[in-house]
């Protein structure tokens, strides 16, 4: 396990990660940009089988028991074929809707079973929601390479410098904010219960958040000691937050961080120094959409699997 106070991914352009000090260890690579929602392809295949079944079926007529499709009020064969086509389409739509409802119900039951299996009687990491947050979804944000990038190596024009004690020696940590992070925090301030959950140590992350959160919009701060040690990875177990998982979202650049709850995750690219980065702004429309859904996992998990 890492002994460094900072947990972050490797910057391919930063030779400091390979220095003898070994103060900034590497982690997993980030995922690609958040995928767009799409309809699963296997439903079309199921529909084609139903079409084949329905193509040979014509609704019966009370007068001729469906044996004659050419003598109903003088309608032409083309009219009858068109009616049959419309009927088949209606049946197909009803079948697709039924299949989708069944799939969602099965998926929700899987989530319920998963949630129940992870409840082990531990005291939640957070106290119950305060009254003004009741009804809001919980947004869990990573810190390093998601909101900021920190380095023990001096950087040009850092946003702030944090002194950190390591083995009796004070080291200066140079912190740069991701583009638009201030706008991002302001935009979500009243829409979510906001939690920063980092695998870094509190002695580094706490003062960083003091500088970053000038508007005091972050409601909880969770650090490395709140992570779960799983096969050498710091995993952020969302089931320990004391919040309903269907209303919990995590934004993180490291897939290992949300290993237990990938269906709750919005992956974000790791940020180091790209001044043109707009990832945080690009997240806002998606977050606004998730506010409106009952179970965020149904949206995020479907997008992740397509």
Curated annotation (Swiss-Prot):
Residues at the active site: 142, 144
Disulfide pairings: none
Segments of this protein annotated with the region Disordered: 1-45, 61-116
Binding site for Mg(2+): 142, 144, 253
Reactions catalysed according to its record: O-phospho-L-seryl-[protein] + H2O = L-seryl-[protein] + phosphate; O-phospho-L-threonyl-[protein] + H2O = L-threonyl-[protein] + phosphate
Entry-linked InterPro entries: Dullard_phosphatase, FCP1_dom, HAD-like_sf, HAD_sf, TIM50
Biased composition (Low complexity): 61-111
Keywords: Hydrolase, Magnesium, Metal-binding, Nucleus, Protein phosphatase
GO cellular component: nucleus
Signal sequence interval, chain numbering: none
Cofactor: Mg(2+)
Cofactor, free-text remark: Binds 1 Mg(2+) ion per monomer.
Biased composition (Polar residues): 1-36
Enzyme Commission identifier(s): 3.1.3.16
Summary of the function given for this chain in its UniProt record: May function as a phosphatase involved in the regulation of cell growth and differentiation.
Subunit details: Monomer.
NCBIfam families: HIF-SF_euk
Protein name as it appears in the record: Probable C-terminal domain small phosphatase
Native source species: Dictyostelium discoideum
Gene: fcpA
């Amino acid at each position: 396990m890492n002994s460094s106070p900072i947990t972050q991914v490797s910057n391919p352009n930063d030779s400091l990660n390979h220095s003898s000090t070994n103060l900034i260890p590497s982690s997993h690579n980030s995922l690609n940009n958040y995928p767009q929602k799409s309809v699963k392809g296997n439903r079309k295949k199921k529909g084609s089988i139903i079409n084949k079944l329905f193509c040979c079926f014509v609704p019966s007529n009370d007068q001729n028991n469906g044996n004659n499709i050419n003598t109903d009020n003088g309608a032409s064969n083309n009219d009858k074929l068109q009616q049959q086509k419309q009927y088949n389409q209606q049946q197909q739509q009803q079948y697709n809707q039924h299949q989708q409802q069944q799939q969602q119900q099965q998926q929700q039951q899987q989530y319920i079973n998963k949630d129940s299996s992870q409840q082990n009687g531990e005291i939640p990491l957070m106290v119950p929601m305060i009254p003004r947050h009741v009804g809001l979804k919980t947004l869990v944000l990573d810190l390093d390479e998601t909101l900021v990038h920190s380095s023990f190596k001096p950087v040009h024009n850092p946003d702030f410098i944090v002194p950190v004690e390591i083995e009796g020696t004070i080291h200066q940590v140079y912190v740069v904010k991701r583009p638009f992070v201030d706008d991002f925090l302001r935009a979500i301030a009243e829409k979510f219960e906001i939690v920063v959950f980092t695998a870094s140590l509190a002695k580094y992350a706490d003062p960083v958040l003091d500088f970053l959160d000038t508007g005091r919009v972050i409601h909880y701060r969770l650090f490395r000691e709140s992570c779960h040690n799983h096969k050498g990875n710091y995993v952020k177990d969302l089931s320990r937050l004391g919040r309903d998982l269907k209303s919990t979202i995590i934004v993180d650049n490291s897939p290992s961080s949300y290993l237990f709850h990938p269906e709750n995750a919005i992956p974000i690219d790791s940020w180091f120094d790209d001044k043109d980065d707009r990832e945080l702004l690009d997240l806002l429309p998606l977050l606004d959409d998730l506010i409106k859904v009952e179970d965020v996992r149904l949206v995020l998990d479907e997008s992740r699997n397509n």
